[in-house]
Amino acid sequence: MIFQKNVKNYWKDSYNKLSKLNQLITRSNLLGSDLKVTNFGGGNTSSKIQVKDPITKKMETILYVKGSGGDLGSIKEDGFASLYQEKFNSLKNIYRGFNFEDEMVSYYPMCT
């Protein structure tokens, strides 16, 4: 691919030993620090990660999404919103269509 010829791969094999969340953070920082890939302060990353819920002790799929306005090149864990995937997927049951998308934002905290 042409893209691969022009973009350096900064990923190190040692990063594979990091937790999935720390891999997301590292991947985000690497992408955000390469201005061939993203503009300063721009870019978005997300990942679905299996996590043990500290309250229920059940394994849950959590969707980590880079918050708006954060710098991808320096983002840390607190720069990601975390949403329970199952709850987030349930929002489709109350979705009323494109003209009502703004009202969905108020439901996001119910998915955290």
Label each PLM-derived region with a short phrase:
Residues 1-23:
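Flexible inter-domain linker/hinge segments
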Residues 18-112:
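N-terminal low-complexity or amphipathic/hydrophobic leaders
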